[in-house]
Amino acid sequence: VAIVERERHLGGILRQCIHPGFGLSHFKQELTGPEYAQRFIDQVRTTDIALFLDSMVLGIDSGKPTEDTAVHTVTLMSPTGMLQLIGRAVVLAMGCRERTRSEIKIPGSRPAGVFTAGLAQRYINIENLKPGSRAVILGSGDIGLIMARRCTLEGTSVEGVYELMPYANGLRRNVKNCLDDFGIPLHLSPTVTRVIGHD
């Protein structure tokens, strides 16, 4: 078994989710995202699973199946150069990608300072960068609510969270802990229809 990871560290998106709320069902303990990921990383490191970190899969080719099994060749670029792994099965565990602005149908110019919630979260929690001094958050799912609180804690003035639906999409506890406790307004039913800006 081998794990190919494009980042330098295992853990995926959990590394930037520094808020608690993970691990309750699996470990019967409330953990942050990095703590939760580390539990699994520690388990992996006790095995003979080969780890290819800071590596990018370039292609997956399937050969002709034999009577017993199919053969797959995974070509990857690693810090040591190009490698090929051969196996009977390939599991794509790539997480998810956030929808871009064009995918959620928001027209307008493309100025700097418009981020997906995940990118803003990475900037703050991993890169130690502040995305801006003022923010408006579109969407009241849990990540939007958590980022409203996180931005506020980092000194960004969050003008409000705007939700297209007439109700918040995140957990009620997150509305209370992330918005109500910090005085961040939640605007239900309006949404962004256009982005206007320069640079």
Spans of features found by a protein language model:
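Beta1-alpha1 glycine-rich phosphate/pyrophosphate-binding loop at the start
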Residues: 1-39, 43, 131-177, 185
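Fold-independent oxyanion-binding glycine-rich loops
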Residues: 6-7, 17-18, 54-56, 77-79, ...
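Short glycine-/acidic-enriched loop or helix-start segments at secondary-structure transitions
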Residues: 13, 62-63, 101-103, 146-148, ...
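FAD-binding core/adjacent interface of flavoenzyme oxidoreductases
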Residues: 40-134
